[in-house]
């Protein structure tokens, strides 16, 4: 499909700089064949803090469990599915925790190296540092707290065909976004030509929006916005969006025909083969029950709900639209709705 059919508005100028900006949508497939191009992935896992929230005190955002796997492992799986086998993960003081979690997650991650930005470098600085010594023709950078459901191959095609220095994935409700009036919301996914990073300072905090893009404009380099439908990239920015992402992932799994290793499907629910769920338990909607968990008699699980490993749901309890992490115990007759219960949490019995 030709770019003009997909909504590319070539030559739309930036009034301030005069640089070329184009718009491409995420539907369909490009005719450009990037075979033979070496592509390297960069995951930006050193995300900004939420503030002094409860979840932040428990775990860094890329390690939040989504379907009982770290959020960042879903990002890495997306890169691997798109054909990227080498990834550099950029983190901060959470590097050791992320390395340990990914080693135990059992997910389909590509080969990973780590870059620890002890001093804050910002996203552009981290990407430049991660690319040092790389022979890649293309760099795909993605935040570590998103779940993309877009065709990575088509995104790379669009970037290469446009000869852009930088491509930003944005979400828009319009089929053909108007860059001047509706530029779309950035989704935390970028495709770089390596030479676009030449002007990024090797020291200090370097941002993409505030520093790199204006610099590319000044140099007359082309920037492409690649528009995808709203909801095709799920971002986790806080507790509410975390619950929404967990529910989205479970609903998406339920609607797909894919199998999940170690789990058996019961209606809309997924039960681990080592989980013990009493026959009298009522399952309503998509429910995900992890390894070695026990759900006792006459309980009710209403989806979308995820239950981690080694949890115990005592008799007559009700768990609805919630995310329970590992080792949680819910007392007999307790009622949970729209809740997050962290590792080893205890919910007392109900009346």
Annotate each predicted stretch with a short phrase:
Residues 44, 66, 90, 117, ...:
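Generic beta-sheet signal
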Residues 3, 10-19, 23, 46, ...:
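Glycine-rich hexapeptide-repeat left-handed beta-helix
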Residues 89, 96-179:
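Conserved beta-loop-beta/alpha segment of the NTase-like Rossmann-fold superfamily
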Residues 71-75, 125-129, 212:
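Well-ordered alpha-helical segments embedded in enzymatic catalytic cores
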Residues 2-4, 10, 14-99, 110:
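N-terminal glycine-rich phosphate-binding loop and ensuing alpha1 helix
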Residues 217-311, 318:
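Extended, small-residue-rich solenoid/repeat segments and analogous flexible loops
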Residues 138-140, 147-148, 153-160, 167, ...:
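Catalytic-core segments of class I nucleotidyltransferases/pyrophosphorylases
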């Amino acid at each position: 499909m030709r770019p003009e059919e997909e909504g590319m508005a070539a030559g739309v100028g930036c009034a301030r700089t005069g640089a070329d900006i184009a718009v491409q949508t995420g539907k369909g497939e490009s005719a450009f064949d990037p075979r033979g191009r070496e592509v390297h992935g960069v995951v930006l896992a050193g995300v900004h803090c939420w503030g002094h929230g409860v979840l932040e005190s428990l775990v860094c955002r890329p390690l939040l469990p989504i379907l009982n796997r770290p959020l960042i492992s879903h990002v890495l799986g997306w890169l691997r599915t798109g054909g990227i086998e080498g990834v550099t993960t950029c983190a901060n003081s959470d590097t050791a925790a992320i390395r340990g979690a990914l080693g135990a997650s059992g997910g389909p991650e590509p080969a990973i190296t780590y870059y620890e930005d002890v001093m804050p470098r910002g996203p552009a600085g981290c990407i430049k540092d991660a690319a040092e010594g790389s022979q890649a023709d293309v760099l795909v950078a993605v935040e570590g707290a998103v779940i993309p459901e877009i065709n990575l191959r088509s995104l790379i095609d669009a970037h290469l065909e446009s000869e852009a220095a930088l491509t930003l994935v944005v979400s828009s409700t319009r089929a053909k976004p108007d860059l001047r009036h509706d530029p779309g919301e950035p989704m935390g996914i970028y495709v770089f030509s390596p030479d676009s990073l030449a002007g990024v300072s090797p020291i200090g905090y370097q941002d993409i929006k505030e520093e790199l893009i204006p610099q590319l404009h000044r140099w007359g380099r082309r920037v492409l916005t690649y528009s995808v439908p709203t909801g095709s990239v799920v971002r986790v920015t806080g507790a509410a969006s975390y619950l929404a992402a967990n529910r989205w992932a479970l609903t998406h799994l339920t609607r797909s025909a894919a199998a999940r290793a170690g789990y058996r499907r019961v209606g809309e629910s997924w039960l681990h083969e080592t989980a013990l769920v009493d026959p009298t338990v009522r399952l309503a909607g998509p429910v995900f029950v992890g390894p070695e968990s026990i759900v006792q008699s006459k309980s009710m699980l209403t989806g979308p709900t995820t239950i981690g490993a080694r949890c115990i749901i005592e008799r007559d309890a009700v768990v609805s639209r919630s995310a329970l992490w590992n080792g949680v115990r819910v007392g007999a007759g307790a009622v949970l709705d729209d809740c997050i219960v962290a590792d080893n949490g205890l919910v007392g019995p109900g009346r």
